[in-house]
A protein has these predicted regions:
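Catalytic cores of DNA base-excision repair glycosylases
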Residues: 3-196, 200-214
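Short, intrinsically disordered, charge-balanced linker/junction segments flanking boundaries
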Residues: 217-222
Length: 222
């Protein structure tokens, strides 16, 4: 069984039951992605529910007072995320009649949405075959393929994105993207991963070459 199919099979057995995974509605998916930037799932979950309860739709978020949004955000830090969230909701409500762009190309034009978030929403909501590349993906791919490129370099991001696009299941892009991120979050963790219990322990090059703890490689800033 190849990497992609094995990964998806693992995910279907081991995945966490997270509320934003049970929908293709772009609004809660977008909310979850913004909340979870720089934030752990356990910490972000109550905020996700609070925002959905207070603002069930993007239009209701748009008409909210900014101070109300910031108050609900209190404790998460990085308040520019909350301001961008509110401004983007207003743009979608007022300029797009409350309808999210339905493609990566359209989503990435929105304020506060970068390459990763656009890819996540496009694949999870619309099943568009675009790869997500975050810290988890860097780690899984660099270890499995034994890639020692410096992940702080811009060209490395392109290298990993191209490789992730090759691995991506064109039939099930949302499932694959969720699977590779979940694998990095639960199994292929940054420190002391339990490689003896890993589905890839006979094919992972980092394990074979005793480089699990040094990959992915990131140069120290001088």
């Amino acid at each position: 069984m190849n990497f992609t199919n094995l990964l998806i099979e693992w995910y279907l057995q081991k995945k966490r039951d997270l509320p934003w995974r049970n929908t293709t509605n772009p609004y809660p998916i977008w909310l979850s992605e913004i909340i979870l930037q720089q934030t752990r799932v356990a910490q972000g979950m109550p905020y996700f529910y609070a925002f959905l309860e207070s603002f069930p739709t993007v239009k209701e978020l748009a008409i909210a007072d900014e101070q109300q949004v910031l108050k609900l955000w209190q404790g998460l830090g990085y308040y520019s995320r909350a301001r961008n969230l509110h401004q983007t909701a207003q743009y979608i409500a007022n300029e797009l009649d409350g309808v999210f762009p339905n493609s990566y190309a359209g989503l990435i034009q929105l304020k506060g949405i970068g390459e990763y978030t656009a890819a996540a929403i496009a694949s999870f909501a619309y099943n568009e075959p675009v790869p997500v590349v975050d810290g988890n993906v860097f780690r899984v791919v660099s270890r499995y393929f034994g890639i020692e490129s410096d992940i702080s370099a811009g060209k490395t991001k392109k290298e990993f994105t191209a490789l992730a696009a090759e691995l991506l299941s064109k039939e099930q892009p949302a499932l694959f993207n969720q699977a590779i991120m979940e694998f990095g979050a639960l199994q292929c963790v940054p420190k002391n991963p339990r490689c003896e219990n890993c589905i890839f322990n006979t094919s992972c090059l980092a394990l074979k070459n005793n480089k699990v703890n040094v990959l992915p490689f990131k140069s120290k800033k001088t």
